[in-house]
């Protein structure tokens, strides 16, 4: 099963991706983890990404796409994967579609974890990070909405919404149900 998880910061995507990965026996692929691993391992893609990050620049989408493509070609992802934090734009969604088509496959589902802005504020402020002020959090939500609304339209035929409010196990059960599990 090949799944994309969408949702605002604090919606619980990472937590649910871990649980789904364990239950379904497929890897969770997070772009943040990919960057850290490739940089730590000193891979050519990691070194290229590090040059941008060290200069304080955003890593170009094309490089992120190459990292994801390299990761989905690993043996443990042959039967599927859960993408957490990718794609972030319609352009990346198109690149992912092309990657999968080149491998004679496609996405099975796109889950959007939905949480109210008030709930997200409560969750994110509860993490205790110094930079999680109301203003910063609201800006991150605004950026997420601006980036993601076009993605929701792009994936409208495959999109399933998951109410991400409630106990972890309740949300997990809803996610599994949305995947037909």
From Swiss-Prot:
Q: What residue ranges carry the coiled-coil annotation?
A: none
Positions with a binding annotation for AMP: 31, 36, 57-59, 85-88, 92, 129, 140
Kindly give the Pfam families that the UniProt entry links to this protein: ADK (PF00406)
Keyword Iron part of the UniProt annotation: no
Which reaction(s) does its UniProt entry say it catalyses?
AMP + ATP = 2 ADP
Q: Which UniProt keywords apply?
A: ATP-binding, Cytoplasm, Kinase, Nucleotide biosynthesis, Nucleotide-binding, Transferase
Q: Name one GO biological process term.
A: AMP salvage
Binding residues annotated for ATP, in chain numbering: 10-15, 127, 166
Q: Which GO terms describe its cellular component?
A: cytoplasm
Say yes or no: keyword ATP-binding present. Answer: yes
Region described as NMP: spans on this chain: 30-59
Specify where the region named LID lies, as residue ranges: 126-132
Q: Which branch of life, at top level? A: Bacteria
Cell location: Cytoplasm
* Pathway assignment: Purine metabolism; AMP biosynthesis via salvage pathway; AMP from ADP: step 1/1
GO function term, MF aspect, one:
adenylate kinase activity
Q: Which residues cross the membrane?
A: none
Question: Which SUPFAM superfamilies does the entry link to?
Answer: P-loop containing nucleoside triphosphate hydrolases
Enzyme Commission (EC) number: 2.7.4.3
**Primary localisation category:** cytoplasm
Subunit text: Monomer.
State the family it belongs to: Belongs to the adenylate kinase family.
Which PANTHER family does the UniProt record give?
Answer: NUCLEOTIDE KINASE (PTHR23359)
What does the UniProt record say this protein does? Catalyzes the reversible transfer of the terminal phosphate group between ATP and AMP. Plays an important role in cellular energy homeostasis and in adenine nucleotide metabolism.
What domain comment accompanies this record?
A: Consists of three domains, a large central CORE domain and two small peripheral domains, NMPbind and LID, which undergo movements during catalysis. The LID domain closes over the site of phosphoryl transfer upon ATP binding. Assembling and dissambling the active center during each catalytic cycle provides an effective means to prevent ATP hydrolysis.
This protein is called Adenylate kinase
Per the UniProt record, the source organism is Mycolicibacterium smegmatis (strain ATCC 700084 / mc(2)155) (Mycobacterium smegmatis)
């Amino acid at each position: 099963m090949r799944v994309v998880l969408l949702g605002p910061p604090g919606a619980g995507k990472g937590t649910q991706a871990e649980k789904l990965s364990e239950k379904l026996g497929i890897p969770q692929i997070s772009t943040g983890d990919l960057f850290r691993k490739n940089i730590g391992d000193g891979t050519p893609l990691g070194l290229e990404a590090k040059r941008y990050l060290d200069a304080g620049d955003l890593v170009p989408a094309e490089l992120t796409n190459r990292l994801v493509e390299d990761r989905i070609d690993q043996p443990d992802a042959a039967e599927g994967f859960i993408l957490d934090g990718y794609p972030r734009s319609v352009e990346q969604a198109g690149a992912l579609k092309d990657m999968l088509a080149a491998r004679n496959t496609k996405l099975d589902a796109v889950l959007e974890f939905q949480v109210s802005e008030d709930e997200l504020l409560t969750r994110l402020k509860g993490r205790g990070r110094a930079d999680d002020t109301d203003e910063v959090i609201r800006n991150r939500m605004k950026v997420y909405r601006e980036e993601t609304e076009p993605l929701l339209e792009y994936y409208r035929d495959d999109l399933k919404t998951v109410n991400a409010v409630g106990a972890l196990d309740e949300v997990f059960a809803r996610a599994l149900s949305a995947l037909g599990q």
